[in-house]
Swiss-Prot record:
Its main location: secreted. Transmembrane segments: none annotated. The gene is Npb. One of its GO terms (molecular function) is G protein-coupled receptor binding. Belongs to the neuropeptide B/W family. This is Neuropeptide B. PANTHER family: NEUROPEPTIDE B. The lineage of its organism: Eukaryota, Metazoa, Chordata, Craniata, Vertebrata. It is found in: Secreted. The keyword Secreted applies.
Amino acid sequence: MARCRTLVAAALALLLPPALAWYKPAAGPHHYSVGRASGLLSSFHRFPSTRRSESPALRVGTGPLRNLEMRPSVRSLALCVKDVTPNLQSCQRQLNSRGTFQCKADVFLSLHETDCQST
């Protein structure tokens, strides 16, 4: 059951659209980010020797996925999305975002590298 939840969480993360490049870090190793994005961008400027070691299990998400743990073996797992079939009858309009809907979908994944290369 936990493996199924992990795969569903990974599939949902893969379905999110890529973020727009709104920030270009300044050249040079001594640049420090300030403001809203400083926490997000701080890892770009760290040297490998100063990085914290990874924890054995990383808690992911809030809401229904808040108890989901991703172990290091699952985080490095290569998977590809074979097919996504949205259930249009389950779509609900998001109140805080204009023109955005949240829908349930059937997501078909593959853990085999050969399946990922054939698409």
